[in-house]
């Protein structure tokens, strides 16, 4: 039996591998990757590489083995994920894996925003497959905001259409730790975890925190969804993705990313990373 992680060279995947290496012998860890060269650092740490491309299902035939515990990290190509995930689920079923854990989105089948559609479809694919599953319904990453600090600092404004909605975010490392815990621990089969930070915050509070830490005046500027979408497209985002992001903001305004179930802290055995900690780390890197 091996612990297998797909998307192992991505931002979340690399952190999951780090977590696994802290508790599991490297020889029991497998990284499924598209590009062997990109994964050279993982191989150097003793992680087995299995090369496969989600867009070419035939390459997935050797990605999994009977008894493997598999972490399916959701793909990053919005619009292609259902087909890609379907190929992985089929390959995992054919191999007879012991567990398929999937990183979905907060709310699962009840999530009512565009970004959730592919995640909901993937969860249904997994349920229909009959595979032993664990659903990791990830909330918002704090890094979704802190990765875009440059324009915020330049213009002195956090621009969004999220109203007074609150966001129970956590760091990417928190979600990685939970994923590692689920594929290395027991008692998680058939479970769906609603993962989010311990504390929800508003964008006005986020702007106030940025002001406090930087010493600059930064405000939350609420704009209509259509205007926000125009701003995002003007900044270079594809129109479809900009529409998804403004739709997420509307979901935030409705309270869809504010839930604090405590599942994330329980799985990791520690409090989630505070917003201020991630903000300070990001500012130090700007």
Where are these predicted regions, by residue range?
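A short helix-to-beta-strand connector/capping loop
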Residues: 44-47, 131, 216-218, 269
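Rossmann-fold cofactor-recognition segment
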Residues: 43-56
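A hydrophobic C-terminal alpha-helical subdomain
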Residues: 226-286
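Short glycine-/small-residue-rich Rossmann-like dinucleotide-binding loops
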Residues: 53, 74-76, 283
């Amino acid at each position: 039996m091996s612990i297998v992680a797909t998307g192992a060279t991505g931002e979340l995947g690399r952190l999951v591998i780090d977590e696994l290496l802290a508790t599991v012998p490297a020889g029991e860890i497998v990284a499924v990757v598209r590009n062997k060269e990109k994964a050279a650092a993982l191989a150097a740490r003793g992680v087995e590489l299995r090369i496969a491309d989600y867009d070419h299902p035939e390459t997935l035939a050797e990605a999994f083995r009977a008894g493997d515990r598999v972490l399916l990290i959701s793909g990053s190509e919005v619009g292609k994920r259902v087909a890609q995930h379907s190929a992985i689920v089929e390959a995992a079923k054919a191999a007879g894996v012991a567990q398929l854990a999937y990183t979905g989105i907060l709310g699962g089948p009840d999530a009512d925003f565009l970004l959730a559609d592919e995640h909901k479809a993937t969860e249904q694919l997994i349920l229909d497959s009959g595979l032993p599953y664990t659903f990791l319904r990830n909330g918002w990453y704090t890094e979704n905001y802190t990765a875009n600090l440059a324009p915020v600092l330049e213009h002195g404004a956090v621009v969004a259409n999220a109203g007074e909605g609150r966001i129970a975010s956590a760091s990417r490392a928190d979600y990685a730790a939970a994923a590692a815990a689920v594929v290395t621990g027991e008692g998680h089969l058939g479970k769906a975890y609603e993962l989010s930070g311990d504390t929800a915050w508003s964008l006005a509070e986020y702007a106030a925190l940025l002001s406090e830490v930087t010493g600059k005046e930064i405000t939350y500027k609420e704009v209509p969804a259509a205007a926000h979408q125009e701003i995002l497209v003007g900044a270079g985002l594809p129109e479809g993705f900009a529409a998804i992001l403004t739709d997420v903001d509307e979901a935030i305004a409705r309270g869809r990313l504010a839930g604090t179930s405590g599942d994330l802290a329980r799985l990791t055995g520690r409090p989630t990373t505070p917003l201020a900690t991630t903000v300070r780390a990001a500012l130090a890197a700007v």
